[in-house]
Amino acid sequence: MQVRLSPAVARAVLGVSPAELDGAVVALDDLWGREASRIREQLGDASSWEDRFALTDALLARRREAGSPVDPEVAWAWDRIVVSRGLVRVDELAAELGWSRKRLWSRFRSQIGLPPKRAVKLVRFDHAAHRLVAGQDAARVAADSGYADQSHLHRDVVAFTGVTPATVAGEPFLAVDDIAWTSQEAPAKTHASGVLRR
């Protein structure tokens, strides 16, 4: 099962700030200890995918409730980035919050795990990648997604994935996940493929 967490809830669910992980791949056992083993057993004992999804959804909701939420301003900034599909400027976010760019960068980085400018690029890339998978023309995707031109889109695709846009367009996991970042308040959505999004 794959679970994709919004960065706005990742700290609460994981029990550690994404900034502390610094992009490292960490085993769930290292984060949750024995609880990870119990979850693995429960998922293995479940008789259907629906039961596995229900178990996972309940676990995520419980951990989110018990965990430390991000600051409301940081959650608002993340949601604004997502709603704009990565087309908002960081200085606009800071101005709307009444914060300096430095304050926004510091709080956002410490709670979300990446600087706001990188988050903007990531969300813009994600939106563009999903449009490529949907079969849209790369030049049109680049223009509509706020890239200066197709070569800038190509550069971001290679930087984020290590492969070309044509390769990304054929990635099957993107075809079942219409968007990566839902609003932090949205309920989990499950798919028959075994992908659970929150």
Model-derived segments and spans:
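A periodicity- and composition-biased signal for non-globular, repetitive helical segments
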Residues: 127-130, 156
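Long, low-complexity intrinsically disordered regions
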Residues: 91, 105-110, 114-120
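Alpha-helical bundle regulatory/interaction domains
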Residues: 1-101, 114-115, 130-133, 138-148, ...
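A secondary-structure capping/hinge motif
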Residues: 108-114, 156-166
